[in-house]
Amino acid sequence: MASEIKVQSSNYENLRILAEYCNVNEILKRIGLRWKMQILYCISEDVYQFTKIKKVFPTLSDQVLAKRISELSEEALIYKSEIPNTTPQQLKYSVTEKGMDLIRIILDLNSWGDKWENQ
């Protein structure tokens, strides 16, 4: 578990100053959580149910998957809906427009990394 940064520390002050000039570090911290972008991408590729995502990533714990889905939903990157005519009622996840914008950026970053990783 990550520890909280003490308010009196120089690290805290540096992060505060950086945040005043640019929020990229905070964005990268939020989207860089383990499994988060992989889950978002899976949902965008029609792997849209909890159990199906688990099959793609069998080592991903139920607890972490539920937490990441909750975070993606709270950040309006995905939304949850019911699959009609299913008993018991089943849920599916879909990517929002905001989420699709982020996926495009992540794919561009991936292409950039592929291009420059050996240089």
Language-model features: where?
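Short, solvent-exposed amphipathic helices
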Residues: 101-117
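N-terminal leader segment of winged-helix/HTH proteins
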Residues: 1-31
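A cross-family signal for key residues in well-ordered alpha-helices
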Residues: 29, 41, 73, 104, ...
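Basic, amphipathic "hinge/linker" alpha-helix immediately C-terminal to the N-terminal HTH DNA-binding motif
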Residues: 85-106
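N-terminal helix-turn-helix DNA-binding core of bacterial DNA-binding proteins
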Residues: 19-64, 85, 90-92
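A short, conserved structural fragment
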Residues: 76-83
